[in-house]
From Swiss-Prot:
Pathway: Amino-acid biosynthesis; L-arginine biosynthesis; carbamoyl phosphate from bicarbonate: step 1/1. GO terms for molecular function: ATP binding; carbamoyl-phosphate synthase (glutamine-hydrolyzing) activity; glutaminase activity. Belongs to the CarA family. Residues 219-407 form the Glutamine amidotransferase type-1 domain. It is found in: Mitochondrion matrix. Heterodimer composed of 2 chains; the small (or glutamine) chain promotes the hydrolysis of glutamine to ammonia, which is used by the large (or ammonia) chain to synthesize carbamoyl phosphate. This is Carbamoyl phosphate synthase arginine-specific small chain. Residues 1-9 form a transit peptide. The lineage of its organism: Eukaryota, Fungi, Dikarya, Ascomycota, Saccharomycotina. The keyword Cell cycle does not apply. Keywords: Amino-acid biosynthesis, Arginine biosynthesis, ATP-binding, Glutamine amidotransferase, Ligase, Mitochondrion, Nucleotide-binding, Transit peptide. Small subunit of the arginine-specific carbamoyl phosphate synthase (CPSase). CPSase catalyzes the formation of carbamoyl phosphate from the ammonia moiety of glutamine, carbonate, and phosphate donated by ATP, the first step of the arginine biosynthetic pathway. The small subunit (glutamine amidotransferase) binds and cleaves glutamine to supply the large subunit with the substrate ammonia. It catalyses: hydrogencarbonate + L-glutamine + 2 ATP + H2O = carbamoyl phosphate + L-glutamate + 2 ADP + phosphate + 2 H(+).
Amino acid sequence: MLSATKRYLATAAAAAATNTTTTSKAFTNTTSQLGRATLTIKDGPVFNGYSFGANRNVSGEAVFTTSLVGYPESMTDPSYRGQILCFTQPLIGNYGVPSSTAKDQFNLLKYMESPKVQCIGIVVADAALEYSHWTAVESLQQWCKRSGVAAITGVDTRQLVSYLRDKGSSLGRITIGEEYDADEDAAFEDPGAINLVHKVTTKAPFHIACPPQYSKGIHIAVLDCGAKENILRCLVERGASLTVFPYDYPIDKIANKFDGIFISNGPGDPTHCSTTVNNLKKIITNHQDLPIFGICLGHQLLALASGAKTIKLKYGNRAHNIPAIDLITGNCHITSQNHGYAVDANTLSENWQPYFTNLNDLSNEGMIHKYQPIFSTQFHPEAKGGPLDTSFLFDKFFDNINVYKKSNGLNLPPVENSLLVDILPKERVE
């Protein structure tokens, strides 16, 4: 008896021979329609390939992600601001790109992590110029061109990633054209030398109201260092309304008007955010019962505010499958990560203790205050993309908020009746 697979292949072959069936269009990755492009690593190798994105030259920090899926989420993640992102997955673009403007029931972007592409360029081994997925509205090539993102395909990404792994994250540039002099004296721009958070934060406070059917009467202040949409979604879907502030807003002056403080992810060197660090110091000192939760850059800023130090990793951790151990329970979780800096756990003060540790490189992945309801993680519990193993940390934050509200007998006015909320816009201010 023929197996199901053999029967399918036999039927498909017969149908193809008689041309009596319609088949989906094959993925065509021909480079005949593409112009030449070059990726140059500063003081390193040069890779020739083909341009399938915007016709512009770009430079920035070259980094890589080993994530198998989620390229729309990665490319719109503000933590990738100013970077040239290399995908180790050989074929990228085969399921296209979904709508960049579609919203969910919370008025948050449904598929993207921010309103626009944040990385300045992408590098792939094989770009799928055709796509197939029910949510897709355009190809990766069309999206890159429309968004002004340089994109190069036909690159030996294994060689590139091996170099970055051994030498560390390096500056790179993508140039478009038939001929390019690799020795040309052109600047390699270092995004790490500037305050990237200032470029991705909201320019003014705005409010996200929790729909009545979800609301639990909780009001959280969010410091937007480049917050991913799914982080905001994880807070709202648990019953909180959010007031989102620019990263350097003097939140310490109004912290007592909120049930909790959240510090988001974001790009670049945390030491550039000294104003935020000083504001957090005041909150930790003057509002000792107030629940605080930080993710990624938010974790690093809390660490700096507590007196600890941060370090730049050799090539960073950017993947959807990194194991991190909970040092309190001993449980191991698979986490989604995207960062080039980390907290030096050896510099934590006596009031803090490590919460999670990366089992690949033993870098710090979280910390928790011994006496106050404050904790933070280097990894992304909201995922998108990635596993949901650590989504319980949002529940932990809300548990802390409920204890805080109950123990302090808080009876704040309804969130939506606040004068502050009434005058704020309802979406991010670019």
